[in-house]
């Protein structure tokens, strides 16, 4: 007779613990819980990668909207930043555009100067 020992029980308890809070069979039945947990872990892994892309897209959209008020577009602005030697990343620039418009305006003016010199 085959003995289903502690390791098997431990494995099942671990899966059911991860499935706690799921609805219906997904939180009670080991087989259903295992499927749900595997899918959830896959989504978790995938979305950690996607989150970075989505935030970058959001920052770019905010910067683009902010610089258009000053007669520039995003790509020209980023080019001007490089020429002016300003090393602020997109996250900081987007935050500055939303929370500190005066400082952002100064950055835009520096960029415009750098673009006109060259």
Swiss-Prot record:
PROSITE patterns xref list: RIBOSOMAL_L20 (PS00937)
CDD domains, alphabetized: Ribosomal_L20
One GO MF term attached to the UniProt entry: rRNA binding
Gene Ontology cellular-component annotations: cytosolic large ribosomal subunit
GO biological process, one term: translation
Keywords linked to the UniProt accession: Ribonucleoprotein, Ribosomal protein, RNA-binding, rRNA-binding
Domain of life: Bacteria
Gene3D superfamilies: 6.10.160.10, Ribosomal protein L20 (1.10.1900.20)
A Pfam family recorded for this sequence: Ribosomal_L20
Family (UniProt): Belongs to the bacterial ribosomal protein bL20 family.
Entry function: Binds directly to 23S ribosomal RNA and is necessary for the in vitro assembly process of the 50S ribosomal subunit. It is not involved in the protein synthesizing functions of that subunit.
Protein name, as recorded: Large ribosomal subunit protein bL20
Annotated organism of origin: Aquifex aeolicus (strain VF5)
Protein encoded by which gene: rplT
């Amino acid at each position: 007779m085959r003995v289903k020992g502690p390791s098997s029980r431990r494995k099942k308890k671990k899966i059911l613990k991860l499935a706690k809070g799921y609805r219906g069979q997904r939180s009670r039945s080991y087989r259903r819980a295992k499927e749900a947990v595997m899918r959830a872990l896959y989504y978790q892994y995938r979305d950690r990668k996607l989150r970075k892309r989505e935030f970058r897209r959001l920052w770019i959209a905010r910067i683009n909207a902010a610089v258009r008020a000053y007669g520039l577009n995003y790509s020209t602005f980023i080019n001007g930043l490089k020429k002016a030697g300003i090393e602020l990343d997109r996250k900081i620039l987007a935050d500055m555009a939303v929370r500190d418009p005066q400082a952002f305006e100064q950055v835009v003016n520096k960029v415009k100067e750098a673009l006109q010199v060259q």
